[in-house]
Structures are given as C-alpha cells and as structure tokens.
Amino acid sequence: MIAIIDYGSGNLRSIANAFRKIGADALVTSDPQILEAADALVLPGVGAFGSAMAKLEGLRETLLGNIMDGKPFLGICLGLQVLLSESQESPGVHGLDLIPGRVIRIPPGNKVPHMGWNQLIIVEDSQLLEGAEDEYFYFVHSYYAEPSNDVVVARTDYGVEMTAAIESDNIHATQFHPEKSGEAGLDVLRNFVEIIRA
C-alpha cells in the first residue's frame, strides 16, 4: 500500500486517483501507524515552504525515520522542496534536510509562477523517469530546488535551467506534477510502483 501523506497542503485526491488509475493501492492518511505500515510514502503539496514545515511538524519524526530506513519515497512539487535544508521563501525555517541545499526564487525576468507544460532534460539515468526523455510535464511553482550534492536527474528550461527531478537512494522527487501530466505522468507513477516492487 502507498501512503499519501495528508498534512493539509494541496489536492490529494488527484494523486490518489492517479495511482488508482494505474491499479496501485493508495491511501490518503495522516496516521503515523499507517505510514509505518505502508510500502511507500508520497508527499505531495502546493503552497509555502514555511507553512508546509509547520504542518509537517507532528509527522516529521515518522517521515524521517521511514525514509532513513530505506522506504521508497516520492515527493511532488512542494514535497520535493521540503526535502532540502532551507528556502528563500521562508527564511529561518529548516526543511527536512535530507538533501543538502536550498530552494530559491525563479529569477526576475521570468513569469512567476512557472505554470504550464515544459519539457524534461534528463541529465542522469533515472529509474523514476525511464521513458520520459523529451516528454512534457505540468509545472506550477515560483521557487525551485538547488541541491548542493549530485542528486539532480532532470532539469527543465524556463529562461534558467531548474531542477525538475531528483533521486538519492530511496528518495525520488519531482518539481512537476505527474498526476496532472497525462499519460507521461502516469508512466512516472508506474515507474515508482515498479521501484516499490523491486
């Protein structure tokens, strides 16, 4: 069972429906016992970094423990950003710090938010993004991750090359929304299900 973490940030129904569409057993929950029992964790989310970290506070220990124990994890949009150490959006707020680095604002001169379809540039082999080369995915964000270690597997060009996906051991995360990205997005979720089964 895939546990989609409900921490009051974003439309969780669409990601749950996308997993069900590909035949995966997915449950939206904030119950730590269910998170512990799950085969994998998914952290979606939209909104502000600081607000998300405050809402995650009660689940932080469970979340970190499961990820550090090797449970497959997929972060989506804000769920990618909170993996990093800090964000320009919320100075002084600490992220989960599983991926060293910071989240920075899309530079001036670019329309913010970056909203709509954009193409992936695959920069490293990726289990999650197998078959996604040159595909278009749906993005909605004003900030992007800038990891300080070598975890970026895909970028997208929006006047500046931005992190589109990262992978580090059992941690997988996308800045784009696979659940809103048509068949290409469903393929990414299928790949995640295969990672869980491996």
UniProtKB/Swiss-Prot annotation:
Keywords tagged on the record: Amino-acid biosynthesis, Cytoplasm, Glutamine amidotransferase, Histidine biosynthesis, Hydrolase, Lyase
Origin superkingdom: Archaea
Pathway this chain belongs to: Amino-acid biosynthesis; L-histidine biosynthesis; L-histidine from 5-phospho-alpha-D-ribose 1-diphosphate: step 5/9
Record keyword Glycosyltransferase present: no
GO CC annotation terms, alphabetical: cytoplasm
EC code: 4.3.2.10, 3.5.1.2
PROSITE patterns: GATASE_TYPE_1
Catalytic activity, reaction form: 5-[(5-phospho-1-deoxy-D-ribulos-1-ylimino)methylamino]-1-(5-phospho-beta-D-ribosyl)imidazole-4-carboxamide + L-glutamine = D-erythro-1-(imidazol-4-yl)glycerol 3-phosphate + 5-amino-1-(5-phospho-beta-D-ribosyl)imidazole-4-carboxamide + L-glutamate + H(+); L-glutamine + H2O = L-glutamate + NH4(+)
Coiled coil: none
Compartment(s) where it occurs, according to its Swiss-Prot or TrEMBL record: Cytoplasm
GO molecular function list: glutaminase activity; imidazoleglycerol-phosphate synthase activity; lyase activity
Residue ranges of domain Glutamine amidotransferase type-1 in the record: 1-198
InterPro entries reported in the protein's UniProt record: Class_I_gatase-like, GATASE, Imidazole-glycPsynth_HisH
Active-site residues annotated for this sequence: C77, H177, E179
Gene Ontology BP, a term: L-histidine biosynthetic process
Listed name of the protein: Imidazole glycerol phosphate synthase subunit HisH
Organism, scientific name: Methanothermobacter thermautotrophicus (strain ATCC 29096 / DSM 1053 / JCM 10044 / NBRC 100330 / Delta H)
Gene that this polypeptide is encoded by: hisH
